[in-house]
Amino acid sequence: MKSSLFSRYTCFVLSILLTLVFLIMMRNHPWFWLPALACGGLMVLGIYDLTQQRHAICRNYPIIGRLRFFFEFIRPELRQYFLEQDNEEIPFSRTQRTLVYRRAKNEMGDKPFGTLLDVYQTGYECIGHSMRPVEAADPTSFRITIGGADCRQPYSASIFNISAMSFGALSANAIRALNLGAAKGNFYHDTGEGSISRYHRENNGDLVWELGSGYFGCRTTDGHFDPRRFAEQAQSPQVKMIEIKLSQGAKPGHGGILPAKKVDAEIAATRGVPEGVDCISPASHSAFTTPLEMMHFIQQLRELSGGKPVGFKLCIGHPWEFVAIVKAMLHTRILPDFIVVDGKEGGTGAAPLELSNYMGMPLREGLLFVHNTLVGCGLRDQIKVGASGKIISAFDIASVLVLGADWVNSARGFMFAVGCIQSQSCHTNHCPTGVATQDPLRQKALVVPNKAERVYHFHQNTVKALADMLAAAGVSRPEQLTSHHMLRRITPTEIKVYADIYYYLEPGALLQPEIKSEFYARMWRMATPTSFDQAISLPAA
């Protein structure tokens, strides 16, 4: 017992003894005041540890117990730089980050001595190559025209674009660099729900304005949608499309609040909210409450914007809710110009752990469900579909194209391009590279012209890599890639093509008297265009 007690207080006792020793020795050698001061400081810290009530470990282990907090503080850096395996995705592996960094710097991305991947591991994926490869197409031709029959200003989008990230979440310099890179590379920059800031406008890069439930940039004083203010911004030539945000993969079904102390004059002006007051983003929209009302809201936005493409972004949660939206399309004949499917693996900032880990459908399942539902209702050829969620490489792009996407967006990929090192401190305002902070000194470290070049090169080199992959597979255009080109290892001894793994509906299948798929038949019965709620109650299994 005495031995245990002494070991717990060893550092504290030694600090007292050494303080006394150095004080005595100061009588002969005055310079001993330095170690006396240091040991005295430790002694005072030990006394504080013994008397404080917040940390039990410090009360039991004064002074030395604080090493736990120090090691806990530096653990992420130690893990990332010394312990993490090259292919360990938490959330992005070193191999993935290095790929982005090299492409952003326009450096050679070739790697010698073969793959580091275990090609016999279950889940390994690849694209089948052709014995008759074709010449690689011009990557700049990989563009998609977005805009349906009711759209008067269709937009030609790149196959690879910057996903939604708001000013406020990202620094002013990060926004500048992203938009300047997008302008040079002729691809679009999604504003995120934080509205269009002056930094988005400086370099005139194409913008997709994301409209969240807070209606930032076009809201009334009580937080509702303001048609007049919306029209003023949406009709700007720089704004190419309007995207209604229903949910996002990082925290689906969750609203948000920006504390009053963070709502400075610049954020307030950008979002159209009072300065110094809590900025609330509700979990759901007030402009519509049913799928039918949502379709009419889409039509209203299209008219107010001057006929620009209008669509929505969502992470699939309850499947019947999306089916209800599609039924509302059929009922009203009002169609969105596009739909962006966000996977639950997405997320550029902080989110409640339970929501980021356990809410929402992963991208591939959500994307295929959206694609199948539109195909089954005969609407797929009238609505373009985008995808976002942990997409950074040409292979990532190809793997979602075969599941129904027409184009893709990337957020964290472009964050890496402007300097993000995955410190995972986005929510602390202490981002070490100036990407995700509003600290004026920290964001000064991000040099806009330099990082804009990296954004441009990352996009350019990634799309070029996609063109090379397609050519090796024997196709020249992204839309020619099918589920028969992509393979996945199912067991250590079996590989299947996507066409044999995933279920694809036939055109018009959901409009037939009898729906062959039991799952889609059940979702169809559960959905109604008049409500997001279930139309029927199913018996318990």
Task: Report each predicted region and the residues it spans.
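Phosphate/diphosphate-binding loops
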Residues: 219-246, 362, 367, 372, ...
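Mobile "lid/hinge" segments at catalytic clefts and subdomain interfaces of large enzymes
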Residues: 236-271, 422-441, 459, 466
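A structural motif
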Residues: 186-187, 239, 307, 336, ...
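Conserved, well-structured core domains of diverse proteins
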Residues: 1-188, 194-204, 209-250, 259-260, ...
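Gly/Ser/Thr/Ala-enriched C-terminal appendages of enzymes
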Residues: 392-397, 401-507, 511-528
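Glycine-rich phosphate/ribose-binding loops and adjacent secondary-structure elements
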Residues: 280-443
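Internal alpha/beta core interface subdomains
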Residues: 172, 176, 185, 189, ...
